[in-house]
Amino acid sequence: DVTDALNVKRVEADLNGSELSFTIPAGRLREFVLVQTNQTFPSPEVVGEVASSNLHGLEQRDMIIISAPSLVQQAERLAVAHREKDGLTVEVVTPEAIYNEFSSGTPDATAYRRLMKMFYDRSSSLGNPPKYLLLFGDGIYDNRGISGEVQGVSWSNMLLTFQSQESLNVYSYATDDYFAFLEDNSGSNFSRDKMCLGVGRFPIRTVTEATQMVDKTISYMENKDSGSWKNNVTFVADDGNNEDSFTTNHMKQADQLAEAIEEMQPGFLVNKVYFDAYKRSSLGTYPDVHNEIEKLLKSGQLLINYTGHGSTTHWADESVWTQTDINNSSYKHLPVWVTATCDFTRFDDVKTSAGESVFLNPTSGGIALFT
């Protein structure tokens, strides 16, 4: 009788064939557990050793890099670059150590947040609050790895993701912002809560990708590719129609951003590529928009901003810029990409998204994305 979990009682019973009978006082709803003492119970077995760690004993750090053990060498190489070039204090930690100290050994994305919360809370007395968190590994929506779609995916270099409570395709999302909500009682209202540090992710799955992306990042940090191209910014805006009720919304939004840049940073050369300013082909596409984007990227842009419809493989219904274009790109000047669109840079899918391809292109594409 386990009705009272703090006062479990053994009940004698008689088993006659498939019928079990026992006597118990009536008067209340009770809960019982059947234990067959003549059966063999599972025996605990050793499945591995838990390496000792002491993340709680770390001193305050400017930056934390979470990396799978097989990628630690490349993560440490990036940490050295930030120490030497930016003067940051950086610590590389493994997810297993975080789980052991912050979620009782269970893989849980919230453990990453609890680690950063520890450093953040300590800063009230020790100073030096954490400034950056880098997730050095790709993510996937199924943190438990139980769905058929992810069975063939190698998990060794993956990191967990925060998933929204909603599961419908229109309302569900993944975001790493969650790990930066460190104030007490924050993290439940993303539109209101304040991020307490900068957080980013390298969506890498292999040592080769890790090596290439660290090479790419360090090269950008060294600023060897300086020049007037870093004064160029481009704003691209989708068209609209009555069916989607957007009409000129995307163009107006992009133009507001462009005008703000022109006002606050008059030294920048602002380029505007708005679909409705170009001729639509008989196939319903905008070949001139594609050509203009390609030309501007080749000439060099500090930043390229897109506002409009999109998917994991292309911009706009007209596919003015696609994942194939990104993979085949060879321009050497690496812009920062800002994409106010749908799941262009989805990082929690089995397949690599177009936005991920921007970053993962070893010699072209882009240096970072806000998306």
Q: PLM features: residue spans?
A:
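Cysteine-dependent hydrolase recognition
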Residues: 1-371
